[in-house]
A protein has these predicted regions:
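FIC/Doc superfamily catalytic core
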Residues: 1-356
């Protein structure tokens, strides 16, 4: 693990934008394999570095991995450790994270699953056809109640339709994060696939958050993918006879770190149900105070903090909104004291007046 971190960190710290984006994607993709306790090979790291350097394409990476595992001996060890799965899925996640594509539909969720697990799971890209239960470490061996297999599509479509109706412009950041947690934990609880649900949900989440116009801190996924899974479990588990209620508090800490760059402690042990039956006592308080702005407004503030000389057209292009929308957002931020324009319109600079 330290090997790949040090190999990729130099590109993230010193690299060109293209190399930095690739290195970030690789780190995130590899970190996500922790969800199922999988470890990648050193061969993958060396191949990933070639891709980051621009020597080979991501398609070539995938072909090289296929060839590598096709000719490699000791098949039993490979299957036991599932190293081939970790390597191949890491490459496929990297490919998807670097693509500028997204569709807010249940079919896109299926497409992610198919692309990640084709040739690895028999039912890649297909809804499960049986009901399932899974013993969870964080629940002391108990299981979450997942959706019934014969209602998967209908339940997903219902959740997506509800989310489409949410007006995020009307929500401040705190409420927006609560809503995102509600939606993401809901589609995870449906558990539409036999295997690979959490990694699929994670990729969908990162792609979805990109549509809000800011670059999320994918390091949070890279370093805390098992926490992400356990937080989803706790958001969907209750046992009233034992005084245990479902809580999204842990997931909200994760998303506050992811979206706002906060440094809340993400502890798996704190989520163990038998450690404490009162979730409210367990959860660390968020470090930052509330910021009274929407996710779009936060995206603008973040961009202007890094690019104080940016023009309205630059802002619009970066966050994926129309120039008309930006011309509505910036005066509102100025009026509320969150943003300031120094030295006039023509030669002025933006000054962000809040801590973000």
């Amino acid at each position: 693990r330290k090997f790949y971190m040090s190999e990729f960190d130099k590109y993230i710290v010193q690299g060109e934008p293209d190399k930095k984006a690739k290195a970030n994607a690789w780190q995130t993709a590899i970190g996500l394999q922790d969800v199922d306790g999988l470890k990648t090979s050193e061969y993958l790291i060396k191949t990933a570095v070639q891709h980051i350097e621009g020597d080979i394409t991501i398609s070539q990476v995938k072909d090289m991995l296929d060839d590598y595992y096709q000719v490699r001996g000791n098949r039993e060890d490979i299957e036991k450790e599932r190293t081939d799965e970790a390597d191949k899925v890491s490459a496929r996640i990297t490919e998807m994270l670097l693509e500028k594509t997204f569709s807010f539909t249940p079919d896109f969720l299926l497409r992610i699953h198919q692309r990640l697990f084709e040739g690895i799971y028999k039912h890649a890209g297909a809804y499960r056809t049986v009901n399932i239960s899974k013993k969870e470490w964080v629940l002391g061996g108990d299981t979450v109640m997942y959706s019934s297999y014969d209602m998967l599509r209908e339940t997903l479509e219902y959740d997506f339709e509800l989310e489409k109706r949410v007006d995020y412009n009307a929500l401040n950041v705190d409420l927006a994060i609560k809503q995102i947690c509600k939606f993401i934990s809901g589609i995870w609880q449906i558990h539409p696939f036999r295997e690979g649900n959490t990694r699929t949900t994670a990729v969908f989440t990162m792609k979805y958050l990109q549509t809000f116009g800011f670059t999320v801190n994918n390091d949070v996924f890279k370093d805390n993918s098992w926490y992400f899974r356990n937080a989803l479990v706790r958001a969907n588990y209750k046992n009233l006879p034992k005084g245990i209620h479902s809580t999204s508090d842990y997931l909200e800490l994760f998303f506050r770190n992811l979206i706002l760059g906060e440094k809340n402690v993400l502890s798996n042990r704190s989520m163990l149900v038998f450690e404490s039956q009162s979730a409210n006592k367990e959860v660390s308080k968020c470090q930052n105070g509330s910021l009274d702005c929407s996710l779009d407004e936060l995206a603008v503030l973040r961009f202007l903090k890094e690019n104080p000389d940016a023009k309205q057209t630059d802002i619009a292009k970066h966050i994926g909104k129309s120039e008309r929308t930006i011309k509505r957002i910036t005066p509102s931020l100025i009026e509320r004291g969150l943003l300031e324009r120094e030295n006039g319109k023509r030669n002025g600079r933006w000054v962000v007046k809040c801590d973000i």
